[in-house]
């Protein structure tokens, strides 16, 4: 493992430092031997390399070592250097930090945090023990480091924010020092400095000094013997128990336990072997919190080791030792703060304990506690060496029993041994208690108690964690928490140590509690009793917190920072990921997931189980010390308690499964995540101040370090990428994902920083809590349903990351589970990265959602953080690319996203498999949403009401049809701000389902507030800033969606058809989340509009690249702001085109082509297509999301403007949305959500009339789509199979990480049909989909007939994506109808179809529409064109169905001229049916070209998956080109108000000749995307609605709208390629198509319509037009390309820069800057030694050495005998050598005679050739002549007897002599 490598390299490196310092140190050999491999005791501790032990034990400690090494390098690696440099500085800094922390401990915040953290740590112990020990191990050191460091980091952040006074010296006061400390955190020592209180450094330093003398004296004998004995025992025991220990270590999330194990591995060997060196350090060092402790330990170890291990100590702590410092620091802290532990650890260390920097208080307590703990140590001996075991905590009971007599070393070692034993032993709780008793009697007993209390608490509270998984996780996490609690107590003790009275009291209390706990620990069998004792201990801790007063909150907070720093470390290193892995592995997968869900906060792993426990404990502590915490802290703790109370009520419901509990925690985290967002923002600031690079750097490190773990810990990555993710993307990401990154503990104990930031938010939070309570009530009924959803979706979102967590997820998401496990390892890194982007965004959305209600000020900050997320969308993008395989990231992320969303979807699917019910609910919800949408439009408050009702409906939908509902809602959400708000609700609920009911409530509350803001925002959406914000947010969200889409696309690959449905749903959910992010960001921007500068500055700061792209989008938006509808429509068109083309194919191809996935995002905006390519590499979903966000914003604004009807459309569109998610689900979720929101509004309009029919159709489509997220094409295939025109057969082979789409284009079909086959998983649904598609097509047709105005739009939205062929048919009808409306457009459209397809159909139409179409027409057409364009883009992806963009455009058209559109749609539907009839003949007349056109359209659906590739593929296939032009035509017609535009799109299969122009068009379309978007957005709205209406109404060809079929609005002037002059405008043979509107009644003649090709002249003209427009397309490409490039370059460039930064940070942290440095040192030395050894070995092998050795051995006889053999047998080869040897060696006659004898006898001795050679040098001078004679006399050497033989013999002898000598 990397850990092994790092351990090896690190160990050598560490050994170099270690040996250097060990050489200085008396115990250096022991250190070398024990820590020789070293990351501090890496190998020596176990008797075999710690890495091996890790590996052997877990493979997790290998990762731990790796991560600790990474941490060492990334965070601790510097610390190693800094520690070496500034051990004294570290000591001073530690003193400062300890002072600050002591103050913080007095505040009690640290204790809370430590308790909570200890709980998670302890929980992971059992959980890790129980579950996936190997996956956990990599995080164990890293988790420890990461969790501890992250915890420390988070603590630092928290302490910095709320507790800056708490951590004034540690974090707040010495930010420089913090930076140094964070460097030291980066360097374990500094982290420990941070982590360990002042006493800890002193304890580490002084106890080591004492222990160096004492251990050298008293314990060296015990230590050396004990180290040897115990080293052997410990190594053996560790080897034996290492797996268990590693599990406990992992169970501790490597925070305390893994540190203990590691430390105790370090400590045991070092503590025992070099107890002087490490002895005290290890026992002292094993503080609960590795990060700070590691700092302290590293600092302390350098200090107490006389800086012998200055570098090595940190180094050992780094690799194995970073985990070790957890225990070491814990022990340090315990020794210092809770002197009972110090005495237990150092009972012989009374001097050392007294000498601890604790000073008199510590000395007193050392004596005091030493005696009790010596008594306890004796008790420990009595108590099956439990306390002695606890002393070392990791020492095994055998060794402990053996060495219990050696209370100091024996007890320490025994404690370490037993601690390890306990940690590793299944009786982890008992041994943990035992461990806890001596080692941290207060601390570890606290841990055990906390462990038990946590388990108890979790059990009692269910702690939102499943008891079973949580209890295991509680044991594991409680172990970590115990470590942390021990740290808390230690911190309390240290705080009290700083305040001797308080310390004594705390220590006394700790001793009392420890004794009590020890007593209980003596009875560890009773886990409930343990939990009771834990509760007592928690009470003790609470009492301590009370004793500490404010210090309790401070301790909790400070320790929370430890924990947070652990999270921070996990951000850098998957330390927390270890816990998360432990949690996840434990089947606490929920914890794992939860951590992942909290944006992968590593602390969420600790605090996921822990956050619940931690928050509960925090609540207890907060309740106990609420007076003491700052008002905001206490208030927020109270809020958290209230929130927790609200949620625990839910969460107890949720705890049904660990995932659910985790989810509940995550909802809590998300609920408090807003607070944590602020906190994380501060944390980010802290991280940045600390030089962590802020969230980005942390994320980078986390990515680089955590990504490797991510395979094991995709959730750990999720956690650390939740956490790391929080840190990584942005400060806002941190803020947004603070719950994950900064801490779920922070989330759960937001009272720290979030309270400060959210002090104004508290009332709102209460509001939110009330809303959440209401939501909980609303959700309450659904909670059971949602519970499964939230349980599964939460893991789906959060736990997907790790296959580990898949175990809990598996039951709920069986399909996703399988995929997840696959993806867990494969996409763990990317998935964590994805979690960073997607869950973070989800968190951002949720937090922001809550925040806008909470406080506008907070919201701007959160938008800031979210904008930073957007800005760090780069990092999110980079996070995906961060692992060099962008595809891995994206694929893994995609799969994770799929799990992340797919699980939700799956749960929703499972909950609401009946799409009919979903449809009904969707119809009801859509109608309610219509009402609410109108309300939203009317007033934000009614929007909030609507949100509530819509939320209820959404929840019902979710409960019943979580997949479809989420899809609908996400899409609704994206499409209109009102819908966006609704979708926010939906997305929140989607997220809630992903996160859990608790978060659903929180999100719902947030959404209520957010939606109140959202209507404003939606209204503001038209304004440039909100749009920009939306753009940026959308960029973020789109990025996340891209990520999630890729996740979805990749994860469900293995999943199944249902998984695909879930994937579609999940993508939709992710889109919903992303859209939530969009809308929340929009809402935040609404708030930010209030504080636009802040938003802009934050955008500019954090999302400079995004802002550049966003500014491009903003420029577009501002361009379009004048024509906001156009902007929205244009963006929507882009989105739809992108979604239809890019997303659909992205589903299939995203895994294969993350680039394509990116492109999918960008095809949405053709501009972004090129950008998408960059996005692919840089994962710049941001730029397309910017366009998408612009589209979404504009669309949303437009929807709000035009969307009183939209609500109807919403519901109807929702089915379409599911279709879109299927097609577009992965990169399109935003786009899909955005488009579907509009489409949905339109659909809701239709839904009023044909809602149920369409819903049935859509539900089927949705079901199919959901089943086949990648199978959107499959939908197309299925849809198209009935209608055989151009048949694009896509065989989607879904492999683990890749979706391979093989597209075959056949011209056989009547209608262009895109048949998508999913090789294994999805094919059944493929087959099944055609039916729903056809049924739904008919239903949609009926619905179209019913709701003609919406018919094309809703139907098109639903069908274009879902039923590609049905909509191809239907669109053909709609399109033909549209053509009938616009006769010229129809005839032109055939040509235009080619042209439009070439031009990506959306943009060419947009461009032409802009100039050619009158403003009236433009207004109408634009209104339609956005939808049309969207559908075009979608339909290019999905052929007719893929033209869902048409529904959006139609929706836009309907929004603006919705009334007219409806009437027209109805009128045109009548005409449409007539035109359909006419068009059937026409289509038959145009049959060849139309088939080709439709075929390209369908094929375009596939190729568009690669945004450009897909479009170009479409262009190539001609069908794709036709499909886009059909889309455009259909869009234009839909824009004209013909809701049949989907059919028309489909009905106008473009000639294959479109293909070349299509490709050109796709490029031009990309280029023109901006221009088209800008110009066409106005033209779109104006021209689109009216010109198409005119065309539809008049049925006459509109010369002004030559391309008005789809391009009608602005086709000729703006888009030359469409109207390559004027030829296409009037002369399109489709001009006769005008009658089609009348003729093509909206009868769904799928075959006839699609079959009817553009009039044969139109096809040539189309080809000609295509050829002509291609230059225009180039121009368009210039526009689009410039825009895309602009968007992309800023974003891409920034992203790239950020990627570079992240790469450097990660590469350095991971690979080698620091790791390699350490490794180089160690590796270089080892290599050099190896070389020497190799030389020796080579010589030995060759025989020179052997011969040299053999020479004295008297090998003369052997040589002679060999000579005989050689002469006889190998005369030439061997004989020559033999002769040479023999001549010199056999000079003596005696030798000759012997030789002769030997020759006779020694033919078997030919082996002695080497010996012979050896002798030859010795004899060479004397007997070579005689030997020749002898040889001759031998007779066997006769041949060799020649002088040549003598010469050879002499030469060989000389050579051999040289060699031998």
Swiss-Prot record:
Record localization: Cytoplasm, Cytoskeleton; Cell projection, Dendrite
- Listed InterPro entries: MAP2/MAP4/Tau (IPR027324), MAP2_projctn (IPR013588), MAP_tubulin-bd_rpt (IPR001084)
Q: Which residues carry this modification: Phosphoserine?
A: 28, 37, 136, 140, 143, 221, 224, 285, 348, 478, 498, 522, 552, 598, 605, 610, 628, 728, 732, 739, 741, 825, 884, 893, 939, 1051, 1140-1141, 1146, 1162, 1166, 1353, 1541, 1562, 1594, 1656, 1682, 1816, 1821, 1824, 1829, 1842
Where is composition skewed (Low complexity) in this entry? 839-848, 1548-1559, 1569-1580, 1593-1609, 1816-1829
Region (Disordered) residue spans: 1-86, 109-231, 305-469, 575-688, 766-797, 826-866, 884-903, 929-987, 1006-1026, 1087-1170, 1207-1247, 1343-1384, 1406-1643, 1816-1835
Q: Which UniProt keywords apply?
A: Calmodulin-binding, Cell projection, Cytoplasm, Cytoskeleton, Microtubule, Phosphoprotein, Repeat
Q: Where is the composition biased (Polar residues)?
A: 354-364, 598-613, 780-792, 886-896, 1087-1096, 1514-1523, 1615-1625
Pfam families to which the protein is assigned, alphabetical? MAP2_projctn (PF08377), Tubulin-binding (PF00418)
Gene Ontology terms for molecular function: actin binding; calmodulin binding; dystroglycan binding; microtubule binding; protein kinase binding; SH2 domain binding
Highest taxon of the lineage: Eukaryota
Annotated region Calmodulin-binding: the residues are 1454-1474
This chain's function reads: The exact function of MAP2 is unknown but MAPs may stabilize the microtubules against depolymerization. They also seem to have a stiffening effect on microtubules.
What is the protein name stated in its UniProt record? Answer: Microtubule-associated protein 2
Species name for this entry?
Rattus norvegicus (Rat)
